Amino acid sequence: MAGEADDAIAWVHLSDFHFKTGHDYGRDEVQHALLEDIAMFAGKRDPARGAEPLHLDFIVVTGDIAGSGTADEYVVGERFLRELAGVAGVPADRIFPVPGNHDVDWTRDMAPFLREHIVGRERVEEVWKTPASRRSVFADKLAAYRAFVSRLNPQLRIPEEQPGGFGHRVPRS
């Protein structure tokens, strides 16, 4: 925030958007209200309100960006998050998404993976032994999420490239 120490960090944490195509059940109104609130806090509206504008360093979006992990849902989500970034005065590469259970496309068939990789108890234990091997079970089911992240913020580590973690070191802006 303006007036605070230069090393202070300001961010917005959002979660559970469940972006979908089709009927939105009032989602547009809620998202519009969120954009209005962010615009107000970022000083883009109502300059007479008496408070200094909030300078945001980044936006974190945790879990359930999509409704069911499909590519079309991420198109909707990306469009909104880019609009949010513009209103907040934050570059899109300062948006940090983290997937949730709805970001996994559970409709994708696991049978081919199971047939190819799991034969007997020892093999099952081997697959679940490390974060990297566990991540491989879901890599295909996170394909739409990975494509979304690559478009939104290409510098991020994404599951297939960094098995076992979604961390990212954020330089100060």
Task: Indicate where each model-derived feature is located.
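N-terminal active-site segment of His-dependent metallophosphoesterases
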Residues: 1-76, 80, 88-95, 105-109
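Extended active-site neighborhood of metal-dependent phosphoesterases/phosphodiesterases
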Residues: 78-173
